[in-house]
Regions:
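Active-site beta-alpha connecting loops in nucleotide-dependent enzymes
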Residues: 166, 190, 197-246
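Short, ordered loop/turn segments at secondary-structure junctions
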Residues: 22, 43, 96, 214, ...
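Conserved helix/coil segment N-terminal to the catalytic DExD/H
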Residues: 23-31
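Acidic, Mg2+-coordinating active-site environments of NTP-dependent enzymes
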Residues: 11-13, 17, 35-181, 204
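Conserved nucleotide-sensing/catalytic segment adjacent to the nucleotide-binding pocket
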Residues: 1-21
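Glycine/threonine-rich flexible loop motifs
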Residues: 27, 49-55, 218-221
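Conserved phosphate/oxyanion-binding catalytic-loop motifs
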Residues: 184
Length: 246
């Protein structure tokens, strides 16, 4: 990691957006790094093969903010109140349901995009992102918040969001048939429920969910994900997903 960051500096790269895993925090893989902004999106049952309990998992996540100047916290997550008591850095919250600093109004979610309004620097902005799902609104809110704090111009932020494509996230695959095929990385209970809930609102026919869980990893989440798919999909296919040594 340090070598990679050094190469970036040598090539005049000014900013890095990096996912910092709970494993990396717990094992001090990012020890010595200082972050301008630390972001907490959510916490759900995952990696309990490593952390053992959700409290341990949260404690690992909280370490990020001891290395950050500022925190952006999803105020709608059930662990947000506890996390906010654990951190001492300046922070702001984002969300849709609770009393937060960054929120969206007039939210429209359809089968191909989301659109909403939000105030940024006292200006009402209309945001559109071509990734369907309510979770996209959350991701967009925190992206706008972080970019604005780094003095990125709002016009540039809106243009970037309007054109963003994330391979493997609500990605529609054209198979030349009358049905829709969508690929999503959903690999834990919360993300699987989010994508299936979004699809269920717009599907005109049956929903067939094909998913698996990685081998030699958290086994606790497997039946939970099975229940979610069984509840939200019309038919579920369980398949292998990198079985490793299982």
């Amino acid at each position: 990691l340090q070598k990679l960051l050094k190469d970036m500096v040598d090539n005049d790269i000014k900013y890095v957006v990096m996912e910092v895993s709970s494993h990396a925090l717990e094992l001090d893989r990012v020890y010595g790094l200082h972050f301008i902004i630390g972001i907490f999106t959510n916490l759900s049952e995952e990696h309990l093969d490593f952390h053992k309990t959700m409290d341990n998992y949260l404690n690992a996540k909280a370490k990020l903010f001891a290395q950050s100047d500022y925190a952006l916290i999803n105020g709608d997550d059930i662990y947000a109140p506890k996390l906010l008591k654990m951190i001492s850095v300046k922070h702001a919250t984002f969300g849709l349901d609770n009393d937060v600093n960054l929120t969206a109004t007039d939210v429209r979610v359809n089968a191909s995009y989301v659109e909403f309004k939000m105030y940024v620097n006292k200006m009402l902005e209309t945001v559109r992102v071509n990734i369907p799902g309510r979770f996209t609104v959350y991701n967009s809110l925190v992206a706008i918040g972080a970019a604005s704090m780094l003095n990125v111009q709002m016009d540039a932020i809106l243009l970037a969001l309007a054109n963003v494509k994330v391979p493997g996230r609500s990605e529609v695959i054209d198979v030349g048939k009358t049905f829709t095929v969508m690929v999503d990385y959903a690999h834990n209970p919360s993300s699987l429920e989010a994508i299936l809930s979004s699809v269920k609102k717009h599907a005109k026919g049956r929903i067939i969910c094909v998913f698996g869980c990685g081998g030699d990893r958290d086994k606790i989440k497997r039946p939970i994900m099975g229940e979610i798919s069984g509840r939200l999909a019309d038919f579920t296919v369980i398949t292998t997903d990198n079985p490793r040594n299982e």
